[in-house]
């Protein structure tokens, strides 16, 4: 058996995270989906998933980014989430890091299919 190079788990996760960070298309994304598994953590962070009829995406909004949220999130709500996709190295999982969350259909959006006017807060 020819093993080739052997890497640590940390090295692989770090490499993949670096690949994600170099991909511009993942640095500013807007994703539409239904909220599920929403948890407001005592730290102030919000952990949730976005889902559609075929897939699910793990998401987090950190306490410092909650200025981009002006409503209380609940399971079952349809939203558009703006942020970036990256890898959480410790667990080796990719997720959406939310900066802005807008409910769909409550007057925040003038045109239901056009989200180009949404902008992410600068940090």
Where are these regions (language model features)?
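OB-fold and OB-like beta-barrel modules that bind single-stranded nucleic acids
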Residues: 29-35, 76-87
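OB-fold/S1-family single-stranded nucleic acid-binding modules
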Residues: 86-111
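Short, conserved beta-turn/loop elements at beta-strand boundaries and strand-helix junctions
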Residues: 39-43, 90
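OB-fold (S1/OB) nucleic-acid-binding surfaces
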Residues: 46-59
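Conserved small/polar residues in nucleotide/adenosyl-binding loops
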Residues: 116-122
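Short boundary/loop segments of OB/S1/cold-shock single-stranded nucleic-acid-binding domains
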Residues: 9-27
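Beta-strand/loop nucleic-acid-binding surfaces
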Residues: 57-70
